[in-house]
Amino acid sequence: MYKWLIPAAAAMLAGCAATPGAQLAETKPAASVSNAVPYHWTLGNAPQAHKDMVAEFGKVGLKPGEYVWASTAPSQGDTRIVVDLLTQMTYVYRGDKLLGASSMSSAKTGHITPYGNWTILEKRPFYRSKKYDNAPMPFMQRIDDYGIAFHGGVNPGYPASHGCIRLPMKFAEKLYGVTRLGTKVIIEG
């Protein structure tokens, strides 16, 4: 299926070969990335967000339905959201400062919360699902063309949604208040 990748990868790796007799430097993994948890896809944002939560709030983990939010927030800097599907956590930053962290619920078996880089495409303070029996989706923030969105909802702390990222209601409201259309969303796990 991906046979076209093999020649390209071989050509790329050929350029990485060491010169005979050359001294190779020892390389170490970046300090900001933890390999302790088996991520399927990560650029290091989710593991770093967890470290930032511990440093900022002194919390190692949150129970289902729990969240933390900073008492002060910088007025400058881009807002971004980091979602960790592996640990069922959502983090929000402004610039380099972690504003908040929350437990969440993503897609249950048979459904998908997609990995990757996204942006907020639509925001509505109250919305009803067109796919799932007119289900309420308060503080809805859609990130793709198929209906995947952040919203307030039932948060058991494990994957239980049809693909959306369900958040505790108060956290969903706070998140809605600090984002705008185009806010970056990174989903890892």
Model-derived features with residue positions:
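N-terminal pre-domains immediately preceding structured catalytic cores
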Residues: 2-138, 146-165, 169-189
